[in-house]
Every structure is written in C-alpha cells, then in structure tokens.
Regions:
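A short, N-terminal "cap"/entry segment at the start of jelly-roll beta-barrel domains
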Residues: 36-104, 115
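Conserved short histidine dyad/triad with adjacent acidic residue
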Residues: 104-119, 140-143
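Short, conserved beta-strand element in jelly-roll/cupin
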Residues: 123-135
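A short beta-strand-loop-beta hairpin characteristic of the jelly-roll/cupin
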Residues: 135-170
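Conserved metal-binding segment of the jelly-roll/cupin
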Residues: 169-187
Length: 201
C-alpha cells in the first residue's frame, strides 16, 4: 500500500524494558518518568501541531529529555508540521530554516519484512509520521540482536529474532520517534500478520 509520510532526520546528540526483552533506553527515575508523562499529556511540546500524538511505543522520558536539551529544534519541527498541508505537500527533502533538521516527504510502498533492514543511529533521531495509508514498524530486542554490519555515519544494521520483535501499525493520529536506543525497522507490509510478544506477559 502506498502511503504518504513525513520523516525527520534530527541532528540531536544524544532500554522500553519489557519482561520479554529490552527495546529502548530504560529509566529508573520514577519522578522523571512521572514528569515526562505529565509533560507529554499536557501538549506543551505541540507548538501548533494538532494532527497527532506520540504512539504508545515512544519513549516519553527520552522525548521529554531530548526536547529539553534542544527545545528550539523541536519547536521548529512541530511548527513546520503545523504550517504545511501534509496531505498535498510535494515529495522531496526540506531543510527547516534555522535548524539542523531535514524533513523527507515520501510517497512509496512498503516491503516484506525479509526485504527490510533493521537500523539504529548513534546521533540522529527518527521522527516518522504517516499521514496517509499505513506503515508497519518493528522495534527489535537488544538482548537477542547483534550488529551485522560496520557502523557508517550515521547508521548500523542488526540481525534480530522476528519472534522477539514488537510490531506496530501506523495511524494518521499517531507519530513515531526512534531514539538512538530504539533499534527499528520501517516500511514493512501490513498485509501479513506478525505476532509480537506482549509487553505485559
């Protein structure tokens, strides 16, 4: 299925812990976690952007922490999103003035899981918002994954266990953020059923 989405490569320097594995950067500071959740729910980060909220997979502590480190970058990104017609914008790459952000607008097709590479970034943050159509994302387990390539700025790929991977389908009211500790797969077909381990098992 073709879908229109907006992807940001965020030049911000920078593990979700389930019983089944490790999927993101952990937080042991309950006070910070509570503050981050309250901040996200308050919508103070929106800067006029009202189309979507963070997907449940987003590490809200990292979102809060990275936003506080680089508020002007995040404000500019959300302002850009709020002042564009994302359903009709032309495909291409857009530099957001006054920032290190690049928005990549694509209209493409998903692929089979076997054709998609997992990845993570040491310095970048991926913000992905599918505004039309559906895209499946996967988040892979750190404990059962290992690099299968040399790092090249700014990406590295992994071998991973499908059965330990968490899969999520996009909806137009949610966006995804993949921080450096979120090892992920994008552009996966949604026509096949993948079984994800339950985070509450």
């Amino acid at each position: 299925m073709k879908r229109q989405f907006v992807f940001f490569a965020m030049m911000i320097f920078a593990v979700m812990v389930f019983a089944q594995g490790v999927y993101t950067k952990p937080c042991t500071d309950k006070a910070l976690e509570k503050k981050a959740v309250k901040w996200v729910n308050s919508g103070k980060w929106r800067n006029g952007f009202k189309m979507a909220t963070p997907h449940e997979s987003v590490n809200v502590v990292e979102f809060y922490t990275q936003y506080k480190k680089n508020p002007e970058q995040w404000k500019a990104m959300f302002k850009w999103l709020s002042t564009r017609d994302l359903l009709t914008i032309e495909k291409g790459k857009y530099t957001i003035e006054g920032t290190k952000l690049i928005a990549s607008v694509e209209d493409s097709e998903n692929g089979d899981l076997s054709e998609r590479k997992s990845e993570s970034h040491y310095k970048h943050i991926d913000f992905q918002f599918v505004v039309k159509g559906t895209e499946r994302f996967g988040i892979i387990d750190h404990e059962t994954s290992k690099p299968n390539s040399q790092y090249r700025p700014d990406v590295i790929h992994y071998e991973y266990d499908n059965n330990k991977t968490l899969f999520y389908d996009s909806t137009p009211d949610k966006f995804f953020i993949f921080f450096p500790d979120d090892w992920h797969i994008a552009k996966i077909n949604t026509c096949l059923l993948y079984t994800s381990p339950s985070p509450r098992d």
